[in-house]
A protein has these predicted regions:
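Divalent metal-cofactor coordination and adjacent catalytic microenvironments
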Residues: 1-199
Length: 199
């Protein structure tokens, strides 16, 4: 399985003004924007970390997901939420011949934590032996910062501020996440039962 981001979050969607206010940086100076590239980097790092911990796409972007077989032919759970649209479904055989599956043969079952690609009939199309299925989908809470739930938006600002304030710290342990951030994102994390984990 290979999950790829096909589109990036545009700079205009990043909450740079809100982040500067959160950090209490001075304003009204000729060089107000001198740190913008650095601040954008911390915001992108915080977004990526929270998306990784929660399995959620925060700001809308397109993904492609390549897999060798369906987890269940009656419905394939998608690896990221919330999904707003399935853009395409393509089957490729071992010699890379493509078969585009018509949108009338599948549907999106929306779910806040575990959206599922479902067949319109009884089963999803058979993935060719030695081939793959590629699902292209759009996921995220919306196109702008204001579309995020308030607690996730606050978690991003807190984590980006943590990265900014500890930018020269090298002794932090791996996976370190401030308690306030961890508690804000906890309800968005996937629950894993019976050791199967997310697939």
């Amino acid at each position: 399985m290979l999950l790829m981001e096909e589109t990036a979050v545009p700079d205009a969607a990043l909450p740079l003004t809100e982040f500067k206010a959160h950090l209490r940086l001075g304003t009204g100076f000729a060089d107000d924007d001198i740190q913008d590239p650095v601040l954008e980097g911390f915001l992108r790092a915080a977004l990526a970390a929270i998306e990784g911990r929660t399995g959620k796409a925060l700001i809308e972007k397109d993904f492609s997901w390549v897999l060798h077989d369906w987890q269940d032919p009656a419905g394939q759970p998608l690896p990221v939420a919330p999904v707003s649209a399935i853009l395409s479904l393509v089957l490729r055989d071992r010699v890379d011949e493509e078969e585009v599956i018509g949108a009338s043969l599948y549907r999106l079952e929306r779910d806040a934590h575990r959206p599922v690609l479902r067949p319109v009939g009884h089963r999803l199309p058979i993935v060719p032996t030695g081939g793959v299925a590629e699902i292209v989908f759009r996921a995220g809470y919306g196109t702008g910062w204001g579309d995020l739930p308030a607690d996730l938006a606050q978690a991003v600002l807190l984590l980006a501020a943590h990265y900014y304030e500890h930018r020269s710290e090298t002794a932090l342990r791996e996976g370190c996440m401030p308690f306030g951030v961890a508690s804000l994102i906890e309800r968005y994390r996937k629950v894993r039962l019976l050791g199967g984990g997310a697939r």
